[in-house]
């Protein structure tokens, strides 16, 4: 049985099952490089402030570097009896330099140590995440450039509403992902803070230099209150909340890709690289990756709710409940980074069926609003125009024809305001091209949206 660093107070050893139940090393292993980084900064500070001698600091730092090299070579065996990532690393340090390893923990608690590890880890994740989100936004903009003049039905209630440009639909997601990007940027500010030096909860009597470790670890600022530094996990909750919003947006886009790639829609075809087959139906090409992203949104939501539930009743400061803060963070980070990469690949490689998209705008009544606007522009109150057009649509449905097939004679029987130019107005391409209000689906409006997006992506 390995002797516990806190064992002096106890007469009996931990029960085997209890030891395994309380150990966190099974999932904390990915914190190892960040734990070593934090320790290197801490020991440098201990040496420079004279808390330990310069020679001791150098020996400990050299030992940490050797442990780091072993870690990179895969030569570290993580052991449950060492409880957590901190004691596993310290045990290897002890193997390298002997009892002097015990001085590393001077003026430090595992409470501020683990908080430092998680801040460093999440900073790294957020950096990767922002790059991945930028790449996805660039892909959407590039796809939009190629489809400004590709028409498709716009939907409300999943019913044909008004014709739009496919680029307008894509750029809606660009805006959503841009807000996600901005939320994660703000998350960085709350993560880029140094808790090291808070010790267990009350600070330390040693003359530490927290500004020095802040600079060494490249944090933007230091936590101003030691109790806050070790007890809150709002920076992780913010990450999980932002991740949930991002996954919701990805899930909605996946749902549309699933609909569009179905036989009934046939608007897009997803690449074989992102599809699978059936074990019994030879003809099947299943959009599994889109379905998986849609499904994985649920686990990210669950991780948020889980940590919120853990945190809601915790008194200050550290409680063992906080051990439950990591797995959901790790899982969500893995999930969103992979989901972003897969989504980018799906969009980059999918084939767009322009003909089917545009044809779908002609075999419906999505131009009814154009007719109502046409009458309103000629002086008829819009509510009256709406009523007249609604009645005409009902007649057309009964006759099995569309608005563009109604004769001019019948139109003028409906209203003398209608002239032959109505047929141009009813064309889907005309309808789309005229909607150039700010943010609208008009071709000129979309081009402006795309140009603005390109400027944003250059920042």
Curated annotation (Swiss-Prot):
GO CC, one annotated term: cytosol
Pfam families attached to this UniProt entry: ASL_C2 (PF14698), Lyase_1 (PF00206)
Keyword S-adenosyl-L-methionine part of the UniProt annotation: no
Reaction(s) catalysed (UniProt annotation): 2-(N(omega)-L-arginino)succinate = fumarate + L-arginine
UniProt-listed Gene3D superfamilies: Fumarase/aspartase (C-terminal domain), Fumarase/aspartase (Central domain), Fumarase/aspartase (N-terminal domain)
Cellular localization per UniProt: Cytoplasm
BP terms from Gene Ontology: arginine biosynthetic process via ornithine; L-arginine biosynthetic process
Protein name according to UniProt: Argininosuccinate lyase
Organism, scientific name: Lactococcus lactis subsp. cremoris (strain MG1363)
């Amino acid at each position: 049985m390995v002797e516990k660093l806190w064992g002096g107070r106890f007469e009996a050893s931990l029960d085997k099952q209890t030891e395994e139940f309380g150990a966190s090393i099974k999932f904390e292993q990915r914190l190892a490089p960040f734990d070593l980084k934090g320790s290197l900064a801490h020991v440098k500070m201990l040496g420079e402030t004279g808390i330990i001698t310069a020679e001791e600091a150098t020996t400990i730092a050299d030992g940490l570097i050797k442990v780091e090299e072993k870690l990179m070579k895969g030569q570290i065996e993580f052991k449950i009896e060492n409880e957590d990532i901190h004691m596993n690393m310290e045990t290897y340090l002890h193997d390298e330099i002997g009892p002097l390893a015990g001085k590393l923990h001077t003026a430090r608690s595992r409470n501020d140590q683990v908080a430092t590890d998680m801040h460093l880890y999440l900073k790294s994740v957020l950096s990767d995440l922002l790059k991945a989100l930028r790449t996805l936004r660039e892909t959407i903009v590039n796809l939009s450039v190629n489809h400004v003049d590709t028409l498709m039905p716009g939907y409300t209630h999943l019913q044909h509403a008004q014709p739009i440009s496919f680029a307008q639909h894509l750029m809606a997601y660009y805006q959503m992902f841009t807000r996600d990007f901005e939320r994660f940027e703000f998350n960085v500010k709350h993560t880029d803070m140094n808790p090291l030096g808070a010790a267990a909860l009350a600070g330390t009597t040693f003359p530490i230099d927290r500004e020095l470790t802040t600079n060494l670890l490249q944090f933007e600022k230091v936590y101003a209150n030691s109790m806050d530094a070790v007890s809150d996990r709002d920076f992780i909750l913010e990450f999980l909340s932002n991740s949930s919003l991002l996954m919701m947006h990805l899930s909605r886009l996946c749902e549309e890709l699933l609909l569009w790639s179905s036989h009934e829609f046939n608007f897009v075809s997803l690449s074989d690289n992102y599809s699978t087959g059936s074990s019994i139906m030879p003809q099947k090409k299943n959009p599994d990756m889109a379905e998986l992203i849609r499904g994985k949104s649920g686990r990210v939501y669950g991780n948020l709710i889980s940590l919120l539930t853990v945190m809601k009743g915790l008194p200050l400061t550290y409680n063992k409940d906080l051990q439950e803060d990591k797995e959901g963070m790790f899982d969500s980070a893995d999930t969103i980074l992979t989901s972003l990469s897969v989504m980018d690949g799906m969009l980059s490689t999918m084939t767009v069926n322009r003909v089917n998209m545009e044809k779908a705008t002609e075999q419906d009544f999505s131009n009814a609003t154009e007719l109502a606007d046409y009458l309103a522009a000629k002086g008829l109150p819009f509510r009256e125009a709406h009523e007249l057009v609604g009645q005409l649509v009902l007649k057309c449905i009964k006759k099995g024809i569309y608005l563009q097939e109604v004769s001019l004679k019948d139109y003028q029987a409906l209203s003398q305001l209608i002239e032959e130019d109505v047929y141009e107005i009813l064309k889907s391409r005309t309808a789309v091209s005229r909607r150039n209000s700010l943010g609208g689906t008009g071709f000129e409006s979309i081009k402006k949206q795309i140009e603005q997006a390109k400027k944003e992506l250059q920042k």
